[in-house]
């Protein structure tokens, strides 16, 4: 058996979140709303700094008084702690992208628009991106392999096909390619949700090494299955979602770059958290559209009784929400976790 080796280039077209499982509260980071920046804090160094300045007791009192409303930025400003001193306890800084939505017109607000309602809101808990033992950002090979597994299972490929693949962890990701994005549900309207994630930013290319240990399984077959899975996703679900009022605004905001259009048969793969039920399961890959809708609806009725449980009939689109987000500095919209894959042969082992 000849082992075939490939370089995998994952090009990010929608923010990718691979969660570390760690969530920090707004008392544990500094959110500068005016500049749309979040400064992630080293807790021990913050305590050391506050003790040195004689402010630690005041901070505890502030937390006790304000409770859930407490945020570190407000406390530092109240205590007149200069921003130049923040470097003592700030680990790194990221841009924050919040959804600022015109609910009447179902359009993103332009930051330069004269009729834009001024949105001055804080952040909630922040879901952090995975890092290795050295603190470097990376995407585990298991995350990419898991996404490929869904595609292969959807095409009814044997377990042998999946087990013949081995994928390395990615090369380290430059911290400058990390940003915070807010979850936005897209259907009848564009609905920002109180969920914030650290994500690999759009425009980043992440590299892996993949090996195929099979004489029968080829990179051409894998590419074909990825393309076919995206076509099923597109025809059976996505085209319906983008005809909703929110979906139309999403498209108008640049949510579907030409390179991702199904007519080009792109090797699109959805990766990471928040990409949505259709891309995480095989229902639309294996079943006729009507049957997939019925089966998904039955599952969602059990999981979300307050929404789907109240419905007597299967809605036109199931699930009813497209998972998206927006870069509020450019007003460009994205599907969460949408990526393009490229495979380049390295050699044979």
From Swiss-Prot:
Pfam families: RAMPs. Part of the Csm effector complex that includes Cas10, Csm2, Csm3, Csm4 and Csm5. GO terms for molecular function: RNA binding. This is CRISPR system Cms protein Csm5. It comes from the Bacteria. Keywords: Antiviral defense, RNA-binding. One of its GO terms (biological process) is defense response to virus. CRISPR (clustered regularly interspaced short palindromic repeat) is an adaptive immune system that provides protection against mobile genetic elements (viruses, transposable elements and conjugative plasmids). CRISPR clusters contain spacers, sequences complementary to antecedent mobile elements, and target invading nucleic acids. CRISPR clusters are transcribed and processed into CRISPR RNA (crRNA). This subunit might be involved in maturation of a crRNA intermediate to its mature form. Encoded in a type III-A CRISPR locus. Belongs to the CRISPR-associated Csm5 family. Disulfide bonds: none annotated.
């Amino acid at each position: 058996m000849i082992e075939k080796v490939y370089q995998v280039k994952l090009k990010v077209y929608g923010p990718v979140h691979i969660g570390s499982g760690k969530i920090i509260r707004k008392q544990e980071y500094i959110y500068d709303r005016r500049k749309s920046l979040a400064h992630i804090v080293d807790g021990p160094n913050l305590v050391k700094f506050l003790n040195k300045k004689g402010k630690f007791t005041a901070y505890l009192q502030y937390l006790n008084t304000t409770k859930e409303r407490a945020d570190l930025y407000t406390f530092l400003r109240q205590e007149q702690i200069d921003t130049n001193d923040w470097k003592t306890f700030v680990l790194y800084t990221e841009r924050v992208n919040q959804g600022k939505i015109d609910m009447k017109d179902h359009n993103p607000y332009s930051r330069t628009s004269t009729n834009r309602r001024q949105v001055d809101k804080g952040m909630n808990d922040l879901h952090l991106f995975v890092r290795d033992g050295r603190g470097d950002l990376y995407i585990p090979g298991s995350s990419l392999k898991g996404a490929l597994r869904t595609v292969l299972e959807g095409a009814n490929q044997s377990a042998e096909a999946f087990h013949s693949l081995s994928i390395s962890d990615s090369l380290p990701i430059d911290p400058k390619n990390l940003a915070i994005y807010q979850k936005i549900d897209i259907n009848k309207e564009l609905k920002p949700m109180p969920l914030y994630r650290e994500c690999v930013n759009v425009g980043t290319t992440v590299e892996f090494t993949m090996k195929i240990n099979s004489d029968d399984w080829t990179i051409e077959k894998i590419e074909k299955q990825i393309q076919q899975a995206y076509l099923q996703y597109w025809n059976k679900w996505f085209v319906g979602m983008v005809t909703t009022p929110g979906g139309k605004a999403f498209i108008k905001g640049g949510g579907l770059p030409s390179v991702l259009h199904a007519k080009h048969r792109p090797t699109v793969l959805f990766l990471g958290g928040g990409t949505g039920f259709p891309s995480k399961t095989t229902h639309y890959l294996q079943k006729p559209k009507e049957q997939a809708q019925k089966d998904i609806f039955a599952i969602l009725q059990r999981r979300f009784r307050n929404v789907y449980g109240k419905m007597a009939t299967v809605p036109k689109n199931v699930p009813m929400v497209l998972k998206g987000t927006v870069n509020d500095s450019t007003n460009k919209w994205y599907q969460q976790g949408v990526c393009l894959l490229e495979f380049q042969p390295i050699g044979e082992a």
